[in-house]
Amino acid sequence: MTTEVGSASEVKKGSDQAGADASKEKAKEVENEQTPVSEPEEEKGSQPGPPVERQSTPRLRKRGKDPSENRGISRFIPPWLKKQRSYNLVVAKDGGDKKEPTQADVEDQILGKEESLPEEESRAKGDAEEMAQRKHLEVQVEVREAKPALKSSVETQPAEEVRKDKEETIQDTQEEKLEGGAAKRETKEVQTSELKAEVASQKATKKTKTVLAKVTLLDGTEYSCDLEKRAKGQVLFDRVCEHLNLLEKDYFGLLFQDHPEQKNWLDPAKEIKRQLKNLPWLFTFNVKFYPPDPSQLTEDITRYFLCLQLRQDIASGRLPCSFVTHALLGSYTLQAEHGDYDPEEYDSIDLGDFQFAPAHTKELEEKVSELHKTHRGLSPAQADSQFLENAKRLSMYGVDLHHAKDSEGVDIKLGVCANGLLIYKDRLRINRFAWPKILKISYKRSNFYIKVRPAELEQFESTIGFKLPNHRAAKRLWKVCVEHHTFYRLVSPEQPPKTKFLTLGSKFRYSGRTQAQTREASTLIDRPAPQFERASSKRVSRSLDGAPIGVVDQSPPGEGSVPGPGVISYTTIQDGRRDSKSPTKATPLPAEGKKNTLRVDGDNIYVRHSNLMLEDLDKAQEAILKHQASISELKRNFMASTPEPRPSEWEKRRVTPLPFQPQASSHETLNVVEEKKRAEVGKDESVITEEMNGKEMSPGHGPGETRKVEPVAHKDSTSLSSESSSSSSESEEDVGEYQPHHRVTEGTIREEQEECDEELEEEPGQGAKVVEREAAVPDAVPDRQAGASVLPVETEAQEHVVAQKLPGEKGAHGGTAEQDPREEAEEDPHRVNGEVPHLDLDGLPEIICCSEPPVVKTEMVTISDASQRTEISTKEVPIVQTETKTITYESPQIDGGAGGDSGVLLTAQTITSESASTTTTTHITKTVKGGISETRIEKRIVITGDAALDHDQALAQAIREAREQHPDMSVTRVVVHKETELAEEGEE
């Protein structure tokens, strides 16, 4: 490369130097050609100074070339500009040999300074500094060459002028390029910032992109609003509640349908677009959690929306009820929407606009109109309260049904409610799992599993599985169970499990407020009662349409009411601490001799069914009701009906809340006086609405279902125990599990007590060492059965008959009859706390259950007719003359511990069976004394009749029957007790 540059310089100077310089240039060419070869020798010191200068020159070029060529604008400089460096070096060589070392030193110093600069600083300075340094170097070399080389400078002056002009031109060009490059950089930076701003604004517009959401409200109107596409469900729900002026909003939710025939609840914690894939966004506003006691709601507007939801449930068939119930609820609907009955305006009301029942008939409209006349004076809020008080006692109130199949492929329905999980088959409730009884809920693919707590005598937990249509249905059911358990049972929501690495299964947990938190927040509501228009009638909710003298004051719910002229009267049924009012004119019951039962094959049990669920199938009963043309006829049939069994006092005490206790006295006083007056007329006063039989406890129970018989659970557990609920290898979409933490609230203790009652119904083991048996012997007891295997049958049988007891007998409800003290002392040590009021579970008459304060002193009224005898027992026993006779038999083999130390109580069970003239109560206790298990059976038989009995014969028959029924046990004690009052005799 050096040779080419040197020869090119000589060609340019050929016109000025002709002869003498030619030989010198040739010698220089030879030396330049030999320079690469002589470089190793120069390093060893064999060459003089000038070759060292030539050696440093290529290194300088190499050092100067590499950085400049690798960065900046130097890559775009044409080659003829880069050759100027070699041209200057050639001129320096011609100037003289003495200055060459100095030139090399200067170049090395300048290059050393350049290389010592930081790389970042040299890059920032760019190519402009590099060109300035080169120019400075060339100027210094030329100045130093001027004195010793005058001749050569004169000869080369034109060439230098040309070179200077070219260098200035090159410098100007480079400066212009550098300035242009800087301007371009600034322009690019500005453009980039503008583009970024535009992109950011575009992104902002994309983020604020709105989607139209439409919500169908409970009154049929539609609410629309624009939402951000990334908005969460809570935003939409809050807007809807704000539009409705609703504060108690935790009972409600939004439903959407993303798949045919399947609706899902909108999760407020997730984005809507992640839950609802399709546009437009369509939702329906519904009640999600049905309040077990609507009277505890604070605002009327909340009760109004609950009424609207229940009307939809009734019209769609989700909430089945009888013809009479349809008519009663429809009459309250008319009263709330249109006010008092007005014959002039009634013709203008189109009852076809109201869907009172799935099958809307003309006869139903007539019955609704007749009942509407009796509600004069009720405000809309009061009518809604009465509507809810009757609707909450329906067996399917608040039950969310899901289609499923059991292990044998039989179609069933799983119902989720406030108290637990219900199993329905052919519209019959065949099983119930309370929340305290469930340990874990899980799903895997399309299978749904519940792990049930083992019974007292069981060692292993049982898992019951159900097959759902698909995995979405299984996940939806699982979510509903998680939400219901958290809302009704927990004090505060459970936090989602912490996310771990590579964990499977759903992390879903209920994120809203629980019922306890909602009630606490409701007490803090401090605003005037909101006024709202009812959609169907445009009637203002808080207006009263006149209040005649006989107005029934029913608001707030729970306060007493005084029956006035033309106003429906109420009969109060004391429920421990709360009184339940039922209209006597409104809900007639058909006469029924016995409760219908369903026998389950393979198990010695009866499964009670809900009468309300089967009323639509009972055509004969419906036909009878349809022939009743007037209110008086309805009342007569209602009075003649057989009362249905009532829950035990223990069940009632567990259910009823405390705030209603102070109001019981006034209700009882008013209604007992009314009962006395009616009893004087001679009517059988056993008044109760159809919805009230056993439903005072809580929603989800069938009417009258105060005792739970659940051997079906053991059957399912056996058949499904091999199925696994493991979720270790499934994705989040197909697997989820939930283990309830039973942090109960104040109002949920009743399920725990129900579970204890269920466990006490376990069959006792046989082969005990000592048996003590108390029995009174009737002439014939057809429904007394032997052994523990028939205990569930005896349990069910007691619900079929109305108890007919003398006032003097000692009943399970704390009766006041005189009793042998020895017998009392013998029975009391074996009774579990809470079991005494549980003995005669449904045996008392339906009117007054009198074991709880306040005490109202009344006289006892006995009503007798030719076909039926029913006595009403009160707390005060009339003073009568009685004759008592007691015969006691004690075995000489009595065990010493039988009457003394009772040992450790394991289980206690009480079974009551009744027939027309006989009541049999069996009390079974299992204790452990000194490591020995002892089963003790005490049977008490009460016979009501006029015939005289031979006590000796009764005693012998009792001993004989006891030994025949239990040959492996010994009879230790038999007591025959006879009480004679006037002309009637009672034996115990």
Swiss-Prot record:
Xref: InterPro entries: Band_4.1_C (IPR008379), Band_41_domain (IPR019749), Ez/rad/moesin-like (IPR000798), FA (IPR014847), FERM/acyl-CoA-bd_prot_sf (IPR014352), FERM_2 (IPR035963), FERM_central (IPR019748), FERM_CS (IPR019747)
Keywords noted in UniProt: Acetylation, Actin-binding, Cell cycle, Cell division, Cell membrane, Cytoplasm, Cytoskeleton, Membrane, Mitosis, Phosphoprotein, Transport
UniProt organism field: Mus musculus
Taxonomic lineage from the root: Eukaryota, Metazoa, Chordata, Craniata, Vertebrata
GO cellular component, one term: nucleoplasm
Localization of this protein: Cytoplasm, Cytoskeleton; Cytoplasm, Cell cortex; Cell membrane
Modification Phosphotyrosine occurs at: 606
Domain of life: Eukaryota
Signal peptide (from-to): none
Region (C-terminal (CTD)), start-end ranges: 838-988
Protein name: Band 4.1-like protein 2
Bias kind Basic and acidic residues: ranges: 22-31, 110-148, 160-190, 673-686, 704-717, 739-751, 828-839
